[in-house]
Amino acid sequence: MYQNPSAIPPSFTDPKMLKTHIATQIYAKICFNTTSGQKKIIESLSEYLAESDPAAIFVLNGYAGTGKTTLIAALVGALKDCGIKPVLLAPTGRAAKVLSRYSGEPALTIHKRIYRQRTNADYESKFSLNINQERGAVFIVDEASMLANGSSDGAIFGSGALLDDLVSYVRGGRDCRLILVGDDAQLPPIGADYSPALDPKALSVYGEVIYTSLDEVVRQEAESGILFNATLVRCMLENGICEVPRFRMDFPDIEAVEGGEFMEKLQDCYDRYGRDETIVITRSNKRANRYNDGIRRYVLGAEEEIESGDLLMVVKNNYHFTERTEDCPMNFLANGDIAELRRLRRFEDFYGFRFATAVLSFADYNDAELECKILLDTIASESPSLTREESNRLFCEVEKDYLDIKSKLKRFKEIRENPHFNAVQVKFAYAVTCHKAQGGQWRAVFIDRCLRRRADDARHAALALYGADPCDRQTLSGEFR
């Protein structure tokens, strides 16, 4: 299990002594008194690492404010001190960046780690499951509530079932372990009623599951209005209370913002924290479009439809341009990735759609730049991305350029190489929907009041609250009328 033999204490051949040693190392990394719940988790983790079958899956379901982040950071440090390699993964680039920030170690997206591009890929599948060459490593996956066991991209990635592929990849190594970390109060994967990666019953198909849960808010966070209200909403969900969420506002890190104050407050947060650390979270793409339009026009002073410096969000996975860019740090552009528009080269009208050639910079990938075609039609669309009908129309129009190719297979391959057909679908990223915000963390979060108008809004409200960084005592989590 140990990567560094010199780190193995000679007297710790006994698993029970090894368990004690690991627990001691974890406690040493935590600079405050642990809660009873944290102590139980530390004991369970230590036992899992020292005594359990490596094929067992460990689940840590941690409520907001319970010290889950601190615990994982301590675990990562303890593993390194014990000579055990931690491998940190998250579903999205933004979530990986958050994980890396609090753990102090590099983190990758799951897709970047477990899949590799096929050198002779056919037109239907481009990425196969990579080979896990690790020995005795511990894979820690944060934001596991986002993990689906199906894909809208079919079998472009491995089997098309991300959770299956993740488990298979980890077990493909020698004596590697898998720890899934998340919060089941957050939104499940799109189209799912629950989060399979945090559900012991769903995970039992893979074998032994060790399920643990943190539910005691740590003393340091007791005065956080963000966490108080997140806990309040969680209690509503757990007890089946179907009512409109009502936030308590008498805390220093949360306030109500009247409609007439919104633009001024937003500008203040842009000045204080930066645009990439400030977000508006709302329910629908229609509402997000309205906010993005107003923010660009009245706060940022934008005059054009799209301008250099705009923040954009990728709204549909895209594989075309990363494959054709040398040394690109991203396997693909993921739905939810945020980029700054550095340069606009030209606008084009083709196939009944509008495009632009752009250079995008991705902060979550060390400001890596990528030149690509972007599709402008999705910016103001009220659908999450191109509708099925629009996608079919684009395909049919592009196909007309290749009708001289008689073979349908060859023609389809040529269409898939067309940069306009593969244009990156984007929206503005100043205001986003709850699903798009999941896994991210910002220093200033504005919550649209529409998230508290219906009795079924509790889970959406919880997700919006989780987007605010409770460790930042200056965080503003606002709602506006």
Q: Where are the regions that the model predicts?
A:
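Pre-P-loop entry segment of helicase/translocase ATPase cores
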Residues: 2-8, 12-51, 55-56
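Conserved SAM-binding loop
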Residues: 34, 88, 280
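Short, conserved phosphate/pyrophosphate- and ester-handling motifs at nucleotide-, phospho-/glycolipid
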Residues: 38, 92, 284, 439
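Catalytic phosphate/metal-binding cores of nucleic-acid and nucleotide-processing enzymes, i.e., regions
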Residues: 55, 93, 346, 427, ...
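Conserved helicase motor core of P-loop NTPases
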Residues: 11, 18-23, 41-45, 53, ...
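Short, solvent-exposed amphipathic alpha-helical segments in soluble enzyme
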Residues: 104, 295-299, 462-466
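ASCE P-loop NTPase helicase motor core
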Residues: 42-43, 47, 52-249
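C-terminal accessory regions
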Residues: 350-481
